[in-house]
Amino acid sequence: DNVSILLRYENGTNAVINYFANGSKSYAKERIEVFAQEKVLILDNWRKLEGFGIKGFSKMKSTMDKGHKRQFALLNERMKKGGEPLISFGSIVNTMKASFACIQSLKENRWVEIE
């Protein structure tokens, strides 16, 4: 249950998704690291955000909030009143293409390019 996924986007940026099931339960379950323009943001378990190279910001703590409550409130509002979808159809399609490409890559042990 361990996998590393490298995504390379059309604009030249890269993303790496690591999923490891063999770590300690005492370590944060989810961690996001963003590197851009000599700045770094690290979000640990949706509770602690640290920033490096960002003038006037170093860290912030909060309760865990993955946005589910707000997402369902917005979805309910859109269903009642209409409006733009919360996630564009194109984004959903691209996410599915990337998901299927990951599975294909793991099965065939090769890089998979998405058109």
Short names for language-model regions:
Residues 1-48, 72-83, 114:
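Contiguous beta-strand/loop segments that form the cofactor/metal-binding neighborhood of enzyme cores
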Residues 10, 77-115:
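C-terminal helix-rich "cap/oligomerization" subdomain common to oxidoreductases
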Residues 16, 60-61, 85-88:
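A short, structure-level motif marking secondary-structure boundaries and short turns
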Residues 26-31, 52-62:
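A short, polar/proline- and glycine-enriched secondary-structure boundary/capping micro-motif
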Residues 26-27, 67, 106:
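A generic fold-level signal
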Residues 38-41, 49-52, 65-67, 109-112:
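Short, intrinsically disordered/low-complexity patches at protein termini
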Residues 62-73:
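Active-site loop of classical SDR/Rossmann-like NAD(P)-dependent oxidoreductases
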